[in-house]
């Protein structure tokens, strides 16, 4: 699932400001009408003498982070005239009755009994992560332009580590515009400190462009061959889905500095994927959903498959596998010897289509003559929950024999109930295939022998019996080859598996051994691990949330599970990531917060040759942090029903504990996700705190990641239930704080966060949160894709009650909030616009009207099309300001001013005659 550039430094004027002299339906509150009545009475009593009205719109803009007028009182009327005592008493009596009635109703609304009041809630800690040099209380306010245009994004460098042709370690691929040194070159990390970039560099491409016939080719992406003699080049890249694209592909000869088409017979063909043989002698690629192979010794291209098309995919994933399983565009795997290619065959024949309509003419959307003014419709094979899934099988191509074959296995999952989530080549023609059932709670590890053409299940696990949870797809299983002389008599693999309630590293050896050696254990979790393995020294490198769920540090452990050691400082709060060289002797170490991020290239502890070089310290960003008034971050935990959950509170600069601040809750909350972390980040939430002066709180509730499987798995079959309770209980706890205005609380989120916003408002029914903003929300999980949804909900056929509970259906409860807003892009191929339309229909049926909706034509899930991203955030900001300024309270029950005035005058007349 999936998201987050102009408004000026001053807060926008309330959107509901109107000319009070208009004879129309107005949004004026009862209290405002009472004051207006008094002014009218004054004017009528003193015929011919005008009393200026109160200055409701004097051009000054209210800010919650300004302390000039803590009471927020209205200025006195100018030039007020005296009124006869009897009339004044009557008028003031009427005004008092009106105001009193309004206040009574308001406090009854705010003080009504709360749901879930019996919950055990404990808030712990108030650690201020603010450190000198990162957060300043003075300076300029964070503006929206800066947040949305990358002004606050840390500079970051990626290193493409590559193995040397002879096994050299510490080699990296450099690609830049320095044609003096060479556009594309391989450098030894040891020479990075040299002022002469040509030192020991192997130049692969001298210039950025090259000619093939009359055509000039400019690379979009490049992949050097393992022997570094040829470069596979993609040009003219066109995006498909989130991770996939097509392009024209070329082979560039390093020695001659010349290029040729990958397929000389079809140089303009749009290729979907291409990958090198480990021997550098051939390339396999997919075009028009069929696979081909080109041997470099010939210009001939040979087909591997021929029946690919609209419903059959070879070597690439379809939409749902790209989005929910592989998180990438490849379903092709070469074996280590270059003798076999494994690839996914995907059959979508039974998968229903979903039409995504595009209404705005743009470049690239070609219409037939006479159809230019009709929407363009793209039909996607999209399996919704409970609908038929694509059927997937692993097939193999024998490179030497030129034949495709499949391997049957006894006790395999049936086609309709099989997900293939990972493929890992071992040695000697053996391959590991991780499979799960459709509902992702039964795992099978299959060992396939491509040489003998046999297959067997070597390990299985039922997660529904283990802890009621599920298997998340990942691509991090690591093959460990046998090395008898180094204490490894058999092949094996490392996988992240559940152990005593937390995700840990397990080493399985031999390959068919179902009982592993656990390399890590404890009440903490490893993340997408291992990062790398030093096979010579038997060291496993991994990243873990060991010190705190909100932090990441880097560790090593030996293959026997001994000597777990950090390689970074674990005493200070930090969030690290790491990318290791192919031999694990060097690493790109990234420090991502909470202070200003930096990057270093280092030698790893086992490397006897010491090396360290800072390649980015973000000096410019550090200067900006000093010049701007950034919010202060307070990391805490809250315990709800025995579950300890991480919370971060963003306080405005110059925070005044004697003031009452509005609070905005921001959340995502999807299963296994994490929003509360100690990364340095200046985002929309930072803008809200710094510029608008509101407190922003985020709590990672039950179901989120790195707090243990018990807290994570409790949400299964009932998404949105416990997560909503956690948001509400946290908001109640914050509402009791002396510096929080509990009458001004809002919540917002995008995607799963949009769903959670609506579910929280639905459960809360206006008792805690008065406002909400939901962007691209799921409103019924039967509308979302099968693989993601059924992992957490089972199928609708097996869990009908759960799906009914998770749908946003109690719109009457939504009607009890002051106001909420829903935003969606009509071209969303991920969370379909159908979700919002269905919710709007439910609101219409139940006559609920306290909401706003904004639709962005042709925008997908990221909402970028035609300035949409910038406008969306401006809309969120303006809407929130109006909410916390009380504008939406004023328009809850609009009454024509003229009618109300007439009734008031009639009442006054009767009172005068009494």
UniProtKB/Swiss-Prot annotation:
Q: Identify the Pfam families for this entry.
A: DPPIV_N, Peptidase_S9
The UniProt entry, under SUPFAM superfamilies, shows: alpha/beta-Hydrolases, DPP6 N-terminal domain-like
Q: Point to the regions of Low complexity compositional bias.
A: 26-38
Compartments (UniProt record): Vacuole membrane
Region (Disordered) residue ranges read 1-82
- Reaction catalysed by this enzyme: Release of an N-terminal dipeptide, Xaa-Yaa-|-Zaa-, from a polypeptide, preferentially when Yaa is Pro, provided Zaa is neither Pro nor hydroxyproline
List the stretches on the Cytoplasmic face of the membrane.
Answer: 1-88
Which ranges does the record list as Vacuolar topological domains?
Answer: 110-914
Q: What class of enzyme is it?
A: hydrolase
| A GO MF label | aminopeptidase activity
Segments passing through the bilayer: 89-109
Q: Which GO terms describe its cellular component?
A: fungal-type vacuole membrane; plasma membrane
- Glycosylated residues, chain numbering: 128, 295, 347, 617, 810, 897
Q: Which InterPro entries does this entry report, sorted A to Z?
A: AB_hydrolase_fold, Peptidase_S9_cat, Peptidase_S9B_N, Serine_Prot_S9B/DPPIV
Its Gene Ontology biological processes? proteolysis
**Superkingdom as given in the UniProt entry:** Eukaryota
The record describes its membrane topology as: Single-pass type II membrane protein
Please name the catalytic residues of this protein: 751, 828, 861
Which controlled-vocabulary keywords does the entry list? Aminopeptidase, Glycoprotein, Hydrolase, Membrane, Protease, Serine protease, Signal-anchor, Transmembrane, Transmembrane helix, Vacuole
Could you tell me the EC number(s) of this protein?
3.4.14.5
Instruction: Please describe what this protein does.
Output: Type IV dipeptidyl-peptidase which removes N-terminal dipeptides sequentially from polypeptides having unsubstituted N-termini provided that the penultimate residue is proline.
Return the similarity comment. Answer: Belongs to the peptidase S9B family.
Q: What is this protein called?
A: Probable dipeptidyl-aminopeptidase B
Taxonomic source organism: Uncinocarpus reesii (strain UAMH 1704)
> What does UniProt list as this organism's lineage?
Eukaryota, Fungi, Dikarya, Ascomycota, Pezizomycotina
């Amino acid at each position: 699932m999936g998201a987050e550039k102009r408004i000026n430094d001053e807060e926008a004027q309330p959107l509901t400001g109107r000319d009070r002299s208009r004879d129309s339906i107005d949004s004026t509150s009862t209290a405002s009408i009472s004051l207006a009545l008094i002014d009218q009475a004054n004017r009528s009593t003193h015929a011919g003498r005008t009393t200026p009205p109160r200055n409701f719109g004097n051009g000054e803009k209210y800010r919650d982070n300004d302390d000039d007028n803590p009471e927020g009182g209205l200025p006195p009327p100018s030039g007020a005239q005296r009124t006869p005592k009897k009339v004044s008493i009557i008028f003031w009596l009427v005004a008092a009755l009106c105001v009193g009635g309004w206040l009574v109703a308001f406090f009854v609304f705010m003080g009504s009994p709360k749901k879930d009041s019996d919950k055990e809630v404990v808030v712990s800690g108030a650690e201020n992560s603010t450190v000198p040099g990162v957060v300043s209380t003075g300076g300029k306010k964070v503006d929206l332009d800066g947040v949305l245009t990358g002004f606050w994004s840390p500079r970051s460098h990626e290193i493409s580590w590559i193995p040397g042709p002879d096994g050299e370690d510490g080699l990296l691929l450099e690609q830049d515009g320095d044609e003096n040194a060479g556009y594309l070159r391989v450098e030894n990390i040891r020479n990075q400190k040299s002022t002469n970039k040509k030192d020991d560099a192997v130049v692969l491409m001298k210039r950025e462009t090259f000619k093939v016939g009359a055509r000039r080719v400019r690379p979009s992406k490049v992949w050097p061959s393992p022997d570094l003699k040829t470069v596979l080049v993609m040009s003219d890249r066109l995006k498909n889905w989130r991770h996939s694209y097509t392009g024209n592909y070329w082979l560039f000869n390093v020695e001659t500095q010349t290029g040729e088409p990958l397929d000389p017979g079809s140089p303009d063909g749009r290729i979907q994927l291409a990958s090198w043989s480990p021997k550098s002698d051939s390339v396999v690629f997919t075009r028009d959903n069929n696979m081909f192979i080109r041997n470099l010794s010939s210009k001939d291209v040979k087909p591997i498959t021929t029946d690919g098309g609209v419903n059959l995919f070879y070597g690439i994933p379809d939409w749902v596998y790209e989005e929910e399983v592989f998180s990438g565009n490849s379903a092709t795997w070469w074996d280590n010897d270059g003798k076999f290619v494994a690839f996914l065959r995907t059959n979508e024949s039974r998968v229903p289509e979903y039409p995504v309509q595009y209404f705005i003419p743009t470049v690239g959307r070609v219409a037939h003559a006479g159809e230019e003014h009709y929407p363009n419709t793209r039909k996607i094979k999209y399996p919704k929950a409970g609908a038929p899934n694509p059927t997937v099988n692993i097939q193999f191509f024998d490179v030497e024999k030129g034949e495709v074959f499949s391997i049957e296995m006894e006790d395999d999952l049936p086609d309709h109930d099989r997900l293939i989530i990972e493929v890992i080549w071992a040695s000697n023609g053996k391959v590991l295939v991780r499979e799960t059932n459709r509902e992702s709670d039964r795992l099978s590890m299959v060992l396939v022998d491509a040489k003998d053409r046999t297959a067997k299940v070597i390990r299985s696990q039922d997660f529904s019996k283990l802890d009621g949870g599920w298997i998340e797809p990942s691509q991090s299983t690591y093959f460990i080859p046998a090395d008898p002389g180094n204490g490894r008599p058999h092949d094996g693999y490392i996988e992240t598996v559940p152990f005593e309630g937390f995700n840990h590293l397990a080493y399985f050896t031999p390959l068919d051994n179902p009982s592993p050696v656990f390399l890590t254990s404890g009440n903490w979790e490893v993340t997408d691990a291992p990062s790398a393995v030093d096979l010579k020294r038997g060291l496993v490198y991994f990243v873990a949330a060991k010190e705190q769920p909100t932090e990441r540090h880097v560790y090593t452990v030996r293959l026997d599970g001994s000597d777990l050691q950090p390689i970074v400082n674990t005493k200070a709060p930090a969030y690290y990531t790491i990318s290791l060289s192919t031999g694990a002797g060097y690493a790109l170490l990234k420090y991502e917060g909470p202070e200003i991020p930096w990057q270093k290239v280092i030698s790893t502890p086992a490397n006897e040759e010491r090396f360290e070089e800072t390649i980015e310290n973000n000096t410019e960003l550090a200067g900006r942090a000093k010049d701007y008034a950034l919010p202060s971050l307070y990391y805490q935990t809250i315990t709800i029903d025995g579950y300890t959950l991480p919370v971060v509170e963003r306080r405005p600069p110059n925070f005044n504990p004697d003031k009452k601040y509005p609070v905005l809750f921001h959340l995502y909350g999807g299963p296994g996700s994490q929003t509360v972390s100690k990364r340095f980040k200046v985002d929309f939430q930072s803008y809200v705190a710094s510029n608008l002066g509101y407190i922003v709180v985020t709590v990672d509730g039950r179901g989120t990641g790195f707090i243990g499987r018990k807290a994570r798995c409790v949400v299964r079959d009932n998404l949105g239930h416990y997560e909503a309770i956690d948001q509400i209980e946290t908001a109640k706890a914050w509402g009791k704080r002396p510096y929080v205005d509990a009458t001004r609380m809002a919540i917002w989120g995008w995607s799963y966060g949009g769903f959670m916003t609506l579910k929280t408002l639905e459960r809360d029914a206006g008792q805690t949160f008065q406002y909400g903003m939901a962007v691209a929300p799921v409103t019924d999980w039967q509308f979302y894709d099968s693989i993601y949804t059924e992992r957490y909900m089972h199928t609708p056929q097996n869990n009908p009650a759960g799906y009914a509970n998770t749908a946003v259906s109690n719109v009457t409860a939504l009607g009890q909030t002051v106001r909420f807003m829903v935003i969606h892009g009509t071209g969303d191929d991920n969370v379909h616009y159908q979700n919002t339309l269905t919710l709007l229909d439910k609101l219409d049926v139940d006559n609920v009207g306290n909401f706003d909706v904004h639709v962005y034509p042709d925008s997908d899930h990221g909402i970028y099309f035609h300035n949409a991203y910038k406008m969306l955030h401006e809309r969120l900001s303006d809407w929130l300001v109006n909410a916390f300024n009380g504008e939406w309270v004023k328009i809850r029950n609009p009454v024509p001013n003229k009618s109300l005035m007439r009734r008031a005058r009639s009442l006054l007349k009767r009172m005068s005659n009494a």
